[in-house]
Amino acid sequence: MNALVDQLKSTAAASKATDIRAAFAADPKRFSRFSASFDDLLMDYSKTAVNDEILTLLEKLATEGGVAAKREEMFSGVAINFTEDRAVLHTALRNRSNTPVLVDGKDVMPDVNGVLAAMGKFADGIRSGTLKGATGKAITDVINIGIGGSDLGPVMATLALAPFHDGPRSYFVSNIDGAHIADILKLVSPETTLFIIASKTFTTIETMTNAQTARNFIAKALGEAAVQHHFAAVSTALDKVAAFGIDSARVFGFWDWVGGRYSIWSAIGLPLMIAVGPENFGKFLDGAHAMDNHFRKAPFKENLPMLLGLIGFYHRNVLGYTTRAILPYDQRLSRFPAYLQQLDMESNGKGVTIDGTPVEGNSGPVVWGEPGTNGQHAFYQLIHQGTSIIPAEFMIAANGFEPDLRHQHELLIANCLAQSEALMKGRTFEEAKAQLTSKGMDDKKADFIAPHRVFTGNRPSITFVYDKLTPFALGRLIALYEHRVFVEGVLFRINSFDQWGVELGKELATGLLPVVEGKESAAGHDSSTQGLVAALSKLEK
């Protein structure tokens, strides 16, 4: 595989593949040759530095890297998360065909469907008012308490599908900072609030600390007996959940073959289901399942996750780009960049290969972003004229949900397309100078000012276009990026499904708590940590 990477590097250099502007000038049909569609979802990658030769080499790279074989292992329940000896089967959670999926010889689909049915029954009960609070009032507010995958997915998807909300209001608490839960509790009434505690082990310190605060909120206002009417849990630790005071009928489980950052499809999606209803949640699963089938069956040049993953690898390990910007032109996708940040960086932020040797080249990039057009007035300046090349990924729907605001949506579309065009085309010195002199500036001053108005262009971008951000479309988009991360992880030769860096942070925080509380000396820690503990201790009131 290293030989192919070297060949890609030499081919990119020899063909001047990074001159995207010249490629468009030479080929009027470039868009049609370097774009692909799956139903209404269009992926335009013509503004990246690829050509026919590079695509052929990338296809060989996927073959030599064993992407197809590893893909089938994942879908069939092989324990590809070998450091934890676990299968990776978030795809089973949205397996709408109900084709058997075996883990250790057992079909998991009956259990998956059983939990989904229980979620639907509970969600319907809350939404209809059949399941009430302790005083007999209907639930009007749902607060999900979780962190990481137990928070980012539900937050992102619930916000994204706001036009489909017809259930109780939704809130989310994640940070152990007491300000987070305090600010939200001010907005709700104990009598009409349901808390969902999302923690597989029911031991996550941030989640359980906030859960205890929520429990105190209910018990203080309504009494201990009210707790069972105002809480539900997504967990597998039934004994701990029972000790907390949550009825077993309100506990929804999931499995160790579901990673946190892939868990929105599981019972972790309960707050989303309550917000939009079981039918729309089912359409959300349908969209992801459709992308799963596309990923498994579509030929290379039509396979969106395969193309996206290979171009991502090409940007990272051939052209050396260290970061990628996620730029959805949809305010309701405002948390999508953060969601992808966890999905990508927690999965592919690894330095050791599946053989236990150091990664050669690079692993995952830094992933970040904001919705357009907000980002245009913040960091786009650096993307356009900075010294680092940052591949951008735009997303735009053809239609919004506010027909009376169609003109605003057209402005949004125009801004999105203009940014991708500007990144590719740039502006030469001659063009900049001509623009200045046409406005009356003299030649000498124009020569001085024009360099500041030069844009080098050749900044790569990918643009996704789709009809409308429906539950189906959102599920499809998330699954597309999940599979993109998978493809890149296989090519990086890493395990994309563990997260030992996260575990390290938990261990160290647990060890430091007694020091922060003043129960133990800081002497065993480095001088910086000792100094910081002392400074904070001095400021405590």
Swiss-Prot record:
Which residue stretches, if any, does this entry annotate as coiled coil?
A: none
The record's catalysed reaction(s) read: alpha-D-glucose 6-phosphate = beta-D-fructose 6-phosphate
Keyword Cytoplasm on entry:
yes
Regions that span the bilayer: none
Active site per UniProt: 346, 377, 506
Entry GO MF terms: carbohydrate derivative binding; glucose-6-phosphate isomerase activity; monosaccharide binding
> What's the name of the protein?
Glucose-6-phosphate isomerase
In the record, what lineage is assigned to the organism producing the protein? Bacteria, Pseudomonadati, Pseudomonadota, Alphaproteobacteria, Hyphomicrobiales
The record's gene field reads pgi
